[in-house]
Amino acid sequence: MMNNHFHLQHDHPPQNVAHPFMQQPSTAVPSAPPATYGYLAQPAGQQPQWMTTTYQILPPSVGPATVAKRYYATTGPQTTHPTHPSTIQITNSFAQQSTPPKQQAATSCSPFKANNIRIISTAPSVYSLNKPPQEAHSTYAPVQSYYLPSGGGQTAGQINLLAASGTGKQLQPPPLVPVTNSTSPPSTVVLDRINICINNHYTETPTSLSSSLTTAQQPSPIIPAIQHKAILPLIDSSTADSSSCSSSSVSSSSYSGTATTSAAVVIVDEPDSTTTTPQTPPTTPEAMSSPGKSSPSPPLLATQSLLKGVNSMKPSFKTVEAAPPTPPTPPSPPPPPPAPPVAAPSPAVTYALQEDVFIKCNDGRFYLGTIIDQTSDQYLIRFDDQSEQWCEPDKLRKLGGGSSITAGGGGASTTESTNTSPSGPMCVACKRSDIEDVVEICERCGRGYHRGCTVEIVTGSGIWSCKRCAKPMKMQQPVSHKITKPAGICRQLPYHADKLSWDEKHRVNEEQIYCYCGKPGKFDHNMLQCCKCRNWFHTQCMQNFKKKLLRGDMFFVFCCTVCNNGIEFVRRMQIEWVDVLHIALYNLRKHQHQKYHHLLNDIWPFILEQRHQLPICEKWRTLPETALMERLKQTLKDYSDRFVCGREFKRAPAFYALRHSGPPHIPKVFLEPHEELSDELLEKRFKLMLMPEEPDEGANELPKRVPKDVYEFNTDEDDPVETSEDEIPIKQIIEKAKKQAAQKADKHDELPLKPDLADDNANDGDPGKLPAPIPPLLDANSSRKRKAFRLSKRYDNSRNHCDLSSDENSSSSRGTSSLDLIIPPPVNFLGRNNPFLMATPKKASQGRSISVGTGVGVNGIINSIFKLKGTSKEQPRMVRTIKRRLSAKDITIGPNQEVRRRRTRRLTTAIEVISTTTINPIPSHYLPIYAKDLQPPAPPMGKPTHGRLLRQRPQKQSPSQSRRNSTSSTATSSSSNGIGAPGHSMLDLKQSVNKYFGGAMNRIDAGEPFAIRAKRRMGNGQVQYLVEWGGDTATTAIGLLGN
């Protein structure tokens, strides 16, 4: 097992870094080049430690800068050179193995058995350097690598000479040691992270240094690391020792002019127990390239790849401290106890009430909450779900600044300097905290809003709550987007226009606040853009703009009253035919939701309808239609970059569409706030053609009669209209009906009063005196509202014929019923107020002749219904009996066991005649008339000419009729009372009653249950039965004709 540990001692603040992992005394070279670092060879007399590396932090040198002062790592208890007490020692200890003498000898002479340590700095920026710009870039050189074998017995002077002569690779200083001996003030460098990568190299033993440099080397993979932290002071160039170094450095690109801190955070990656073996394929950046293609020199780390990886990382103090450090894996050999960590005093972080903070919970995540209460050592946090929790300050983190979390583990700890919170509250809408702006604080949640960023704030309203807290569980009320013209001249917008978040083309902002009114809108629909402030304004809110524009018609030069000293500047630009077609296709696409439009069916009618409103010259408006059509066709062909012909997409060539679905391009006219607008400026500077101003008389006549725009209707993108399609016609119909009713009332007053119909009942039967009911003329496509209105109109007209005046005894005067208030009851029920009045059309001759001797009043009406027809010689009509219900007798089973219905033939000539009380027959005009009834009756059979009587075949009778004939007797042809006038026989009476009420045998055939309760015989021999029909207590006496 491998054990990696390090020691950190605090007797003296370390100032320098070196890598002497091989002990070899050397003499300093007085005339050494500028300060560098290098490897020191191991003495030949000592037994080398197998795979052991020591990393030291050296103090500043004492004496001249040219004198090299070195410290050596201890590999045994006896050493001749002192070891500085302030060291960080990283030891890679593998299990000691007993090797044979031959292997031991080979190990001692192998130059690459010892580990090479490379320091790779991933810090993307250096915060401050007290160096001029020309020296700053030369101080930190690109990443370089240099590997030096342990064998060969080279001295320090030889190594320095080797590095200076360029035999090996030119070495660069480590990131902590700048290459200079300048006596300028010490430079300050802040490094976020340093990865120490341990590479093990295994090659055969070369005999000389030159041969070892040309041998291909195979680096081992980087050992998985556990991060530990240590605070190291920065190193000044004036205290650097002179030696050779094989470390790497990263040049920094960010500089600032002030010094911030004197400590750097160094993160040492320590391997864990899952260490890979040397035989594992290499995963280091230098192993990406193939060993066979590598140069004889040792593999290098590319500067570009490393810098790219450095820039892709986001080293920050918060990210490092957010994750707790993982403790190191317990080693197999017990490591020495680590020294107590050095912790800088963390600055005090204060939190205020109603401040939003992050709280770190047990799951490792941060949750947003608001401080609502505090004690001496705890804070009460309320979360968004209304839950509350007491937290200590070390678990809190400021929303916009640093953190007070102190993390420690593995013998190291870090603290981060926090930024102080802003002095005043911040608006949650615009995320700004300006001193001159007033931020209103919600009383419940503590969130702040500028008065211009929300519409709920009312000045002087006292306690205020935001919309989120005022109605947390209710749906938002629909905001009224009705555009109303503001009163007076607007000199100041009710919102902060500079805080709006606009898109790239400055057409739409995220807040949806526009115009003088601060309400939303659509830039391509009745809105114009100011040429100075570039804000968009509704045409309805402008002072003298009365027109409605087409979608995408923004060819105006407009300046608002805020930018133009209270006067609006509006000028219309003249457009070309290509813009006319673009506007036409853009509107058709918005309204019809189609991409392609036919030239003759869609585009041509639209331009003919709208060409008097489009900004084209008067000559083009008066073009003949043939010339206009030719101009449109030629324009569509010439501008193929804006219009698409249907031929390109396998459509008819008469179809066209926009290549890009946006509105037409408008000339950009933007001016500075101090520039003065004029027509000359627009024509000379921007080369615009302006339309002449329209006279005011046309604007005054416009509201009188505005032609209906057939293309002006709502689309899915437009706001919904509150009025439905049926309400407008209903209102028009109601107004028209009121006018007609008033006219009829005036005519009715001019006509002479008619006598009361109740006093003259002789005229009741006259059809000329009765108003015939007028059927309503209902259209199939009319709505229910129209039907209801017409029916109510009929009711109002018919109610005028009745006497609706109420007396003192009526229910409406007592107020006992609301229905009586709506429909007042009449005074009497005579004449037309009779509820049983039936307006029947009758012939005048019959009415005059029969009405003599009839009673007056209700009796006369009943007699008029059931009176005899003296001259009637008609034959009785054949009426089919009513449909009967299906009974069990009608169901049969076929030969194949299928269920069938029994078919019974019903003869239309089978008429049931029963004897009952003598009443007048019902008039024939109340009975249904069929086509077969209109046929003339068959002529009576006369005597044949051949003198022989033909034998008449008996007619087939129905089962019900045969059953009736077998149980009953036949009736006489005339009544017993002697009233046998022609046409008034009992047969006609019984036939009419049977046709109207239905016969007993029909009811029996229909399956209606019945029971015979009694039987009697009359004096004339007629037998009558008392029949009780199923379920009814009432009985009916039915006379059956017997023999």
Swiss-Prot record:
SMART domains: PHD (SM00249), TUDOR (SM00333)
Stretches with biased composition (Basic and acidic residues): 737-757, 793-804
UniProt entry keywords in alphabetical sequence: Chromatin regulator, Chromosome, Developmental protein, Metal-binding, Nucleus, Phosphoprotein, Repeat, Repressor, Transcription, Transcription regulation, Zinc, Zinc-finger
Cellular compartments annotated: Nucleus; Chromosome
Compositional bias of kind Pro residues: 324-344
CDD domains assigned to the protein according to its UniProt record, in alphabetical order: PHD2_MTF2_PHF19_like, Tudor_dPCL-like
Residue ranges with Low complexity bias: 25-34, 807-819, 955-977
GO BP: actin cytoskeleton organization; anterior/posterior axis specification; chromatin organization; negative regulation of DNA-templated transcription; regulation of gene expression; regulation of transcription by RNA polymerase II; ventral cord development
Biased composition range(s): Gly residues: 399-412
Entry protein name: Polycomb protein Pcl
Binding partners and assembly: Component of a form of the Esc/E(z) complex present specifically during early embryogenesis which is composed of Caf1-55, esc, E(z), Su(z)12, Pcl and HDAC1/Rpd3. This complex is distinct from the PRC1 complex, which contains many other PcG proteins like Pc, Ph, Psc, Su(z)2. The two complexes however cooperate and interact together during the first 3 hours of development to establish PcG silencing. Interacts with corto in vitro.
Biased composition (Basic residues): 783-792, 945-954
Superkingdom, natural source: Eukaryota
Record comment regarding domains: The PHD-type zinc fingers mediate the interaction with E(z). In contrast to vertebrate homologs (PHF1, PHF19 and MTF2), the Tudor domain does not bind H3K36me3.
InterPro entries: Mtf2_C_dom, Spp1/CFP1, Tudor, Zinc_finger_PHD-type_CS, Znf_FYVE_PHD, Znf_PHD, Znf_PHD-finger, Znf_RING/FYVE/PHD
Region ranges (Disordered): 1-34, 271-302, 317-346, 395-422, 737-819, 931-985
A cellular component annotation (GO) from this entry: nucleus
Cited SUPFAM superfamilies: FYVE/PHD zinc finger
Ranges for domain Tudor: 349-404
Keyword Ubl conjugation listed: no
Zn-finger segments (PHD-type): 424-472, 512-560
Primary site of residence: nucleus
Role description: Polycomb group (PcG) protein. While PcG proteins are generally required to maintain the transcriptionally repressive state of homeotic genes throughout development, this protein is specifically required during the first 6 hours of embryogenesis to establish the repressed state. Component of the Esc/E(z) complex, which methylates 'Lys-9' and 'Lys-27' residues of histone H3, leading to transcriptional repression of the affected target gene.
Keyword Nucleus: yes
